[in-house]
Amino acid sequence: MAEGSELMSRLMSENADLKKQVRLLKENQMLKRLLSESCQESCGRGSRDLLYPKVPTYPEACSPGNGGPDFGRFAGVPDTPSQLPTSSLEDLLCSHAPLSSEDEASPGCATTSQMPFKSFLSPSELHSRIADRKLSPLLSPLQDSLADKTLLEPREISRPKKVCFSESNLPTGDRSRRTYYLNEIQSFSGAEKDGRIVGEIAFQLDRRILAYVFPGVTRLYGFTVSNIPEKIKQTSIKSLDGSVDEKKLRELTHRYLTLTARLEKLGYSREVHPVFSEFLINTYGILKQRPDLRANPLHSSPAALRKLVIDIVPPKFLGDSLLLLNCLCELSKEDSKPLFAW
């Protein structure tokens, strides 16, 4: 009889401990919800106070016209981005606006994670409940660790996108330079279709440059903006005797230097942007079919293309991407052809 009474008393004690553990788990869930709501509200107030630098203006319309001759499209585009020198972008992106989201913490989130917890439980009550939880031998270590983990989970805070662009109208000596590295390309995001338009912008600019430097050449396989000087020498060699056609060499060189001089006024760099265009094409790809301007007005709207680039391209590469779009718009305006003419 005494053994039965002792067993009953022990079962009742264990049952009370189990109820206490369940109550603690519910309180942990409530604390987690309070912490999350408080941090989101504080971060929401802080993000509304941030100032966004203005995006430079670009031509809002291009004169419609007939597309240029179809020179074909890239046969294959690698899935992995090409590697550029680590300092290849330092001459194009200015540092008047901070770009790295890791450089500064979001305002209002430093202390909010502790305030709801302290206001919900006093230190003495919290200490007593933690002590009670350690008394129960029936709660598995896995359940205990999960209960504690709910209070320590990191909160993902959405931060506003910062935009920086090259100030090509400033004197060279007045510009502040900063180096950015291509191994930070992990922030690239966006739908595949929209991303292909970013690569298409770079592709169309390259094709426009090649078509201008090499007029009449319909097969541009192996031609890139980066190797234009080498290709000028190759195309200037006479096929009959292998001698150099000096007249053709001077003509092609003059066309190349004239065009790059016009683009350099917009901030284009022969050392940086040809390789950067290849990088965008390899990263995003290009449109699978020749753009249909009547079916998709986006391809003929500089404003819509600029908004798409801002939404997709990471901040550290946004300035140079917008510069390529600006150059494409200027060339399209001068030759009276659509933006996507090839």
UniProtKB/Swiss-Prot annotation:
It is found in: Cytoplasm. GO terms for cellular component: centrosome; cytoplasm; sperm head-tail coupling apparatus. Keywords: Cytoplasm, Phosphoprotein. GO terms for molecular function: protein kinase A regulatory subunit binding. The modification Phosphoserine is found at residues 63, 136. It holds the Pfam family Speriolin_N. One of its GO terms (biological process) is positive regulation of cAMP/PKA signal transduction. Its main location: cytoplasm. It comes from the Eukaryota. PANTHER family: SPERIOLIN, SPERIOLIN-LIKE PROTEIN. Belongs to the speriolin family. This is Speriolin-like protein. It comes from Mus musculus (Mouse).
